[in-house]
Structure formats: structure tokens, C-alpha cells
């Protein structure tokens, strides 16, 4: 581990998955329900997410509306506790969340998070929606777009996992090639 000139640990480069929940971790056949009655997370989708994390060593950053209930210290919201337990069953956990002024400015939140965390070497967005500011911030190039949970083949699919892995691991190819 490298040290800063002050003796602290230097931040390691990391990979990040900006994760939406609805339309990514569930589909119309989802029987799992959060305590509020909202659609829960499908095990098959969580297995694919786990595969992405295992093959890339990426961290999960929530961009979903679910994030309003997540706290780094202690979460008491029943829906968030449900999600955290489901993730934990698959060896996954939430690293952080984005903050934006309005739900339609999801790209702004991602951009702000990346600006505040300069140790990110690669990132991908798993989302079933494209927000107006995605193009403005260059997020569309990192977007792996799933289908909304009422559409056919909704949520995270094998091809999405492969695409996300390729995006996250492309930085290793660039580093190996001296770029």
C-alpha cells in the first residue's frame, strides 16, 4: 500500500457500478416484495450482479430512488434493510450513493460523485432509464441499459452483465497497453 507524504494510506483506484434497482434487479415476474409492497429483487438478477462484481472487483453506488433510505451508519428503513439483506446473501453490499437535487438529474448526481471521488479508474451505469442529462455528462457511453420491469426480458440479463464487465475491465487493457 502506498503512503501519502503525510503518512496516510493513498487511495487505491477502484471500479464502480452505479446501480438502479427497479428495472435492473427485478422484472414483471418478480414475486419478492419489499416490506412496503414494492417489487423486490430477483435472485437471478442478483446472481448476475454478483458475477459482474466478482469479475471486476467493482463497488456498488446507488443511483436508484431506493437510495433515499440508505445511510452509511445505520439504516432503519424496512425496505432498505430488505435490500441490504438480499445483497448480503449474494456477498454484495452498498459502498455509497449519489446525491442530486432532483430525480430527473440523475446524471448530475453521477457526475458530482465521480468529481468527488477521483480514485475511480472505471465505471458503468446499470439503469433501465436514460435521463436528459446523461449525454451532457458523457454518461451515455458508460450506460448499460436494461428494460423496465414490465417489458419482455426486463431487468439485468446475461448480455448486460457481459457488457458491464467489458466496460469495467477495459481500463485494465488500456493500462496494459500503456494508455
Annotated model-derived regions:
Residues 81-179:
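C-terminal cap/substrate-recognition subdomain and adjoining C-terminal extension
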Residues 12-57:
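Active-site neighborhood of HAD-like aspartate-dependent phosphohydrolases
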Residues 26-28, 69-73, 132-136, 153:
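Short catalytic/ligand-binding loop motif for oxyanion handling, primarily in non-cytosolic enzymes
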Residues 39-42, 69-73, 101-104:
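Acidic-and-aromatic substrate-binding clefts and catalytic sites of carbohydrate-active enzymes
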Residues 18-31, 64-67, 127-129, 148:
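Short loop/turn segments at strand-loop or loop-helix junctions that form parts
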Amino acid at each position: 500500500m502506498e503512503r501519502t507524504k503525510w503518512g496516510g494510506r493513498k487511495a487505491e483506484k477502484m471500479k464502480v457500478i452505479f446501480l438502479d434497482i427497479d428495472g435492473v434487479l427485478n422484472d414483471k415476474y418478480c414475486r419478492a416484495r419489499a416490506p412496503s409492497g414494492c417489487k423486490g429483487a430477483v435472485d437471478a438478477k442478483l446472481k448476475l450482479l454478483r458475477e459482474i462484481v466478482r469479475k471486476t472487483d467493482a463497488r456498488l453506488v446507488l443511483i436508484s430512488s431506493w437510495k433515499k433510505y440508505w445511510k452509511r451508519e445505520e439504516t432503519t428503513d424496512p425496505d432498505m434493510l430488505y435490500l441490504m439483506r438480499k445483497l448480503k446473501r449474494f456477498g454484495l453490499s452498498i459502498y455509497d450513493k449519489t446525491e442530486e437535487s432532483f430525480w430527473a438529474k440523475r446524471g448530475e448526481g453521477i457526475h458530482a460523485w465521480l468529481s468527488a471521488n477521483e480514485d475511480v479508474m472505471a465505471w458503468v451505469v446499470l439503469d433501465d432509464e436514460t435521463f436528459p442529462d446523461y449525454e451532457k455528462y458523457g454518461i451515455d457511453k458508460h450506460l448499460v441499459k436494461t428494460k423496465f420491469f414490465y417489458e419482455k426480458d426486463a431487468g439485468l440479463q446475461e448480455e448486460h452483465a457481459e457488457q458491464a464487465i467489458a466496460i469495467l475491465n477495459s481500463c485494465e487493457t488500456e493500462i496494459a497497453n500503456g494508455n
